[in-house]
């Protein structure tokens, strides 16, 4: 088994088309991924197939072509824009006599370079270890010269078992740490939910401009760059929205086509901010030729994390890269804002975004069940004045239980006026 490649290395890239329609944007995105990893592409090899070859993924002739390209260019790694099976990866490494990294391994490497917080690093390591676990097989080149003997009935067998055990132990250890992080996040979320502080979560295809928009809105100076996966760690900031008040804005990891499942699983804690959001701001690069495909790719991941039914406002970003395009709000048949056109880079359209946020969030409804002690008759009267009581019943201890429904703005105003209200929630 070969070590992970280092940034600054030189590679041969392999991209295979499985349809008659050769989509050049797929290849361009792959080249962007490679560039984001800090790897120099010496040669790009393309080809067409109806289905992957079981031994090499590509045909045997193409596999030989790749091996010859490695020798001719002096490349130290071959990068595939596809998911390879452990056996395919191993067969190609033997043929090419260098490391072979598939799309999943490449994305994981970029994530490893980008992670900045302790939590982010743990999440990346977990995904890497899960990926590596499928590739721990009897093929370790540094052990093949060992001779069999007592306790060593095969090349490297004992070492292999030890590594598997260490890998399993480390995975369990990281999962335990991430569960603790998730519990802490959940406590913060629950306190926001009780006070009905809305959470607006930015989602979108990688490099759509989410972090630039986040910075424009909050002036938080989150790391933003024109590269894939510039943001990994979730960042939360409080903002003030007219007629709504305090709102939490969350910036999260960008999505991409064919996002490895291990990655989605490892970033569960980060993506939880998206799953629990009041409103999603789906940021879209309006200047990208694959707008619709990028939207569908994001929707696929949202479905995978059970966030596809959360109310969404589309944000068409980068209008400064379109000709004669002015900021505007598009509305649906109910006259609700459903799309805002803006430029996070120049700030054009930010007032329209805040207007849309006000309209969408102030229209949200708070639903709660409370148990009021006998002495809180005045509070009960307030709910009647607001025409918020849907159901009311007496408890054996003399307290009154209420099921209330009211505009979220009214609920938050009442919480500020009556701080004890939170204690009566059940």
UniProtKB/Swiss-Prot annotation:
Against PROSITE patterns, the record matches this protein to: G_HFLX
Query: Which gene does this sequence derive from?
Result: hflX
**Recorded GO CC terms:** cytoplasm; cytosol
Q: Name one GO biological process term.
A: rescue of stalled ribosome
Q: Does the keyword Magnesium apply?
A: yes
Top-level division of the source organism's lineage: Bacteria
- Which co-factors does it depend on? Mg(2+)
What is the name attached to this protein's record?
GTPase HflX
Main localization (coarse): cytoplasm
What are the Hflx-type G domain coordinates in residue numbering?
198-365
NCBIfam families with a match to the protein in the record: GTP_HflX, PRK11058.1
Transmembrane stretches, start-end: none
Relay the activity regulation note: Intrinsic GTPase activity is very slow and can be stimulated by the presence of 50S ribosomal subunits or 70S ribosomes. GTPase activity is inhibited by ATP.
Quaternary state and interactors: Monomer. Associates with the 50S ribosomal subunit. This interaction occurs in the presence of GTP, GDP, ATP or ADP, but not in their absence.
Q: Which GO terms describe its molecular function?
A: ATP binding; ATP hydrolysis activity; GTP binding; GTPase activity; guanosine tetraphosphate binding; metal ion binding; ribosomal large subunit binding; ribosome binding
Which keywords does the record carry?
Answer: ATP-binding, Cytoplasm, GTP-binding, Magnesium, Metal-binding, Nucleotide-binding
Asked if the record carries the keyword Kinase, the reply is no
Q: Where in the cell is it found?
A: Cytoplasm
State what the entry records as the consequence of deleting this gene: Disruption does not affect lambda lysogeny or the transposition frequency of transposable elements.
Query: What remark about domains does the record contain?
Result: Full-length protein is required for specific association with the 50S ribosomal subunit.
User: What functional role does this protein have?
Assistant: GTPase that associates with the 50S ribosomal subunit and may have a role during protein synthesis or ribosome biogenesis. In vitro, also exhibits ATPase activity.
The UniProt similarity line reads: Belongs to the TRAFAC class OBG-HflX-like GTPase superfamily. HflX GTPase family.
Q: Where does Mg(2+) bind?
A: 211, 231
Q: Which InterPro entries match?
A: EFG_III/V, G_HFLX_dom, GTP-bd, GTP-bd_M, GTPase_HflX, GTPase_HflX_N, GTPase_HflX_N_sf, HflX_C
Binding, GTP:
204-211, 229-233, 251-254, 317-320, 343-345
- Xref: SUPFAM superfamilies: EF-G C-terminal domain-like, P-loop containing nucleoside triphosphate hydrolases
């Amino acid at each position: 088994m070969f070590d992970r490649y280092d940034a600054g290395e030189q590679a041969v890239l392999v991209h295979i088309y499985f349809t008659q329609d050769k989509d050049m944007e797929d290849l361009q995105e792959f080249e962007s991924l490679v560039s984001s990893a800090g790897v120099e592409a010496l040669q790009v090899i393309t080809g067409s197939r109806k289905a992957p070859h079981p031994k090499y993924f590509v045909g045997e002739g193409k596999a030989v072509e790749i091996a010859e390209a490695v020798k001719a260019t002096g490349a130290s790694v071959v990068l595939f824009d596809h998911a390879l099976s452990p056996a395919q990866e191993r067969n190609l490494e033997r043929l090419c006599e260098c490391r072979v990294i598939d799309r999943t391994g490449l994305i994981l490497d970029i994530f490893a370079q980008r992670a900045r917080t302790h939590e982010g690093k743990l999440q990346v390591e977990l995904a890497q270890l899960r990926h590596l676990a499928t590739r721990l097989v009897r093929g370790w080149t540094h052990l093949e010269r060992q001779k069999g003997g007592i306790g060593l009935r095969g090349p490297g067998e004992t070492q292999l078992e030890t590594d598997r055990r260490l890998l399993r132990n480390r995975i369990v250890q990281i999962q335990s740490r991430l569960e603790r992080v998730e519990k802490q996040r959940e406590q913060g979320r629950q306190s926001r939910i009780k006070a009905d502080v809305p959470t607006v979560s930015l989602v979108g295809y990688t490099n759509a401009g989410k972090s630039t928009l986040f910075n424009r809105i909050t002036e938080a100076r989150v790391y933003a760059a024109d590269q894939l996966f510039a943001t990994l760690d979730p960042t939360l900031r409080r903002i003030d929205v007219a007629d709504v008040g305090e709102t939490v804005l969350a910036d999260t990891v960008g999505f991409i086509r064919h996002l490895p499942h291990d990655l989605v699983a490892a970033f569960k804690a980060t993506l939880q901010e998206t799953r629990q959001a009041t409103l999603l701001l789906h940021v879209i690069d309006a200047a990208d030729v694959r707008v619709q495909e990028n939207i569908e790719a994001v929707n696929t991941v949202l479905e995978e994390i059970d966030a596809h039914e959360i109310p969404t406002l589309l944000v068409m970003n980068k209008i400064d890269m379109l000709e004669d395009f002015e900021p505007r709000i598009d509305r649906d048949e109910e006259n609700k804002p459903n799309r805002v056109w803006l430029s996070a880079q120049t700030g054009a359209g930010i007032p329209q975004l805040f207007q849309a946020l006000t309209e969408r969030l102030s229209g949200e409804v708070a639903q709660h069940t409370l148990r009021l002690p006998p002495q809180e008759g005045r509070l009960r009267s307030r709910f009647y004045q607001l025409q918020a009581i849907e159901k009311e019943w007496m408890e054996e201890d003399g307290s009154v239980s209420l099921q209330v429904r009211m505009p979220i703005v009214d609920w938050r105003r009442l919480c500020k006026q009556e701080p004890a209200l939170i204690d009566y929630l059940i």
